[in-house]
Amino acid sequence: LVGTFSDRLNSRFGRRHLLMYAGALPLGIMMFCLFSPPAFLSDSQLVGWLFFSVVGLRLAFTVFQVPWVAFGMELSSDYEERSEIIGWRLVAGWIGGVAFSFGMYTFVFGASEGFPQGQLNPNSYPGFAVITGLLVTSWCFLTAHLTRHEIPYLLRPTEPTNYSLLTMFKQFWSLLFNPFYRKLVISMFFLAIVSSFGGFFDAIMNTFFWGLTGEDLRWFGVAILGAALGIFLAVRLSRYYQKQHIIIAALSINMVLAIVKVSLRFFDWVPENGDPMLVWVLVIQEVLHVIVVSMPMTLFPSMLADLSDHQETRSGERQEGTIGAIVGFAMKLTSSVGLILGGLMLDHFIGMPAGAANAGVPIESDVLFRLAISDGIIASCLLVIPISILATYKMSHADIKEIQNQLRYKRHTNHEL
């Protein structure tokens, strides 16, 4: 709904910025609610509060994120420059994320006498909620405000902007019958499942398998170096190789790195937990991991922008909002599947004991072994699925150039008429 509405919106703020402004404040409020439930709630009321907060957060995020993603697709029609724009956006995101994580682990989740691993201290989360809510709203407003000068240069609907559910479904089905879009989206779906499945275990692994504290985890911010290098490599390599081939190579390397990481512990080839050297071994591994993760993060959105040109030749409309919205909705849905699978694994395969989050609760070695197998072996091997799908994706750089030439000729002809 938001994607189709955004594609057909014709306001003084263009097609995207009005919704970006509208989503900023609710997003910060819902973020605060999620991490700061009232203390007087009963268990059943707490479940209701969390449900309301999560659903509200998802809705507010959709209102902001869908036009924001579409806006990024619109900024350039150049095949290579699209990757550069996405790359710079990711660099800004990584810098902000690293600064945020370092600040939180240093000043909010610092160790205390009762909680040597500060991220397990429940008293830290109200302050975290306030800071996060304010920052999210502020950055959303800034993002919209500082890019408003681009509005006059963006495409607008050339026909009356009739909007209905029928219009939405027509655009939806038009995209689903695009074979290139279908393959790309399905590969992203499975990658989202794998990423959320593996991400579910990251905090658990860092806390219980590797024994890291909040002070240790803040040094993982060094991974920003890997993000910068990965984005640079993605942009440079896309000039010489097909984007899908670069993603396949990056995902394959990522799979190997994850397996090697836990294998080093199995063979006792890394320092023991608590040794300061272990932190830096893991930081180096994280830098390598972020290099290969940031490459698909750069190239997937760039490929979606390329597909918006292909889709225009089929439907006659610019559908960046719908393209991004379908992907965003599916990513939310599939990431939830990954979290559910992770929870089931944690309960029925790993056997994590109840109350493990409380400091001092012992965890048996076989539980930690199954945890490592789930995170390092099972989750990483699932990357074979998106790799296999992307191997069948055949749209090339030359194909995109030809499509863009056709669109330029069509727009020039229509303008003369």
Indicate residue ranges for each PLM-predicted region.
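Membrane-embedded alpha-helical bundles of multi-pass transporters/translocases
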Residues: 1-417
